[in-house]
Design a protein with these regions (language model features):
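Membrane-embedded alpha-helical bundles of multi-pass transporters/translocases
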Residues: 1-273
Length: 273
């Protein structure tokens, strides 16, 4: 199903000159945080979640699920905001050289922002799927993936004549959210194991607020450093400053808003060990 989804995007791209490269580079950018966060939760929390669900520990499973979701959102939402707010800075510094010119940067940045909107959905899918697998239900996730495939095809093909190559990115993002909604709906029959507790609901809102604060700070910083980002010898340094400001502002806003607890983060890591 994943390969067919990729094929849909490529088929759309062949009708637009340069689109294959734009979508490829945009996909590489949003796959980076997706891979990092996926590895983090896969190593730290998912083994504990799967183990508890297999032995029928519903309360422990719900706790593990919610803390995994909390950590996922803590890492994913700011990445999403960054991909939406400063895609041009990221693309220009990382890729704009040689035959890759300013117009390519603009097109790739647009696709990056669209892909970024689907990042939380793709990460949260990794949390919901073990809930099904722990109960030896592999058919439901496969059926949900087929639904997502249809959504991808309808959106990408249906919109391509109106909005061009970005229809492929919109299709992938909409498919990601459709898959997540299906997983969430299907997991309801498993009871409390995959339900959001009060702490997760409260902190997810605070994480979003902290990420928006970070986004505003990063946007201002990127505008201020725009001349630096155009200098060949200083571009990487300028981007490093922007990302450093992003991390610092998010950490400060998160602490002030109560978006995370350092003690709980340490406890999650110790539990995984």
């Amino acid at each position: 199903v994943v390969q067919v989804n990729l094929l849909v995007g490529r088929q759309i791209a062949i009708y637009f000159e340069g689109a294959n490269a734009w979508l490829y580079y945009a996909d590489r950018l949003y796959q980076l945080p997706l891979g990092v966060v996926g590895v983090a939760i896969g190593i730290v929390l998912l083994p504990d979640l799967s183990r508890r669900l297999r032995v029928g520990d519903e309360a422990g499973g719900q706790e593990a699920f919610n803390r995994a979701a909390e950590l996922s959102l803590l890492l994913t939402i700011p990445c999403t905001v960054a991909l939406v707010v400063i895609p041009s800075a990221l693309v220009s510094v990382l890729f704009e050289r040689g035959a890759f010119v300013a117009s390519d940067t603009q097109a790739t940045a647009l696709a990056t922002a669209i892909y970024g909107l689907g990042l939380p959905a793709f990460v949260l899918q990794k949390l919901y799927q073990p809930v099904f697998f722990a109960r030896e239900d592999t058919r439901s996730p496969f059926n949900f993936a087929l639904v997502a495939l249809v959504v991808n095809a309808v959106v990408a093909i249906g919109l391509s004549r109106y909005i061009g190559f970005t229809a492929a990115a919109y299709g992938a993002t909409c498919a990601g959210w459709a898959m997540l909604v299906c997983l969430w709906w299907g997991a309801r029959r498993f009871g409390a194991a995959a339900s959001w507790d009060a702490q997760l609901r409260k902190r997810s809102l605070r994480i979003l607020l902290a990420s928006l604060v970070m986004g505003a700070v990063v946007w201002i910083t990127a505008r201020a450093l725009e001349p630096v980002l155009q200098m060949a010898g200083l571009r990487l340094l300028g981007l490093a400053v922007i990302l450093g400001v992003a991390g610092l502002s998010y950490a400060l806003a998160g602490r002030l808003l109560g978006a995370f607890s350092l003690a709980q983060l340490r406890q999650m890591i110790r539990r995984a060990d």
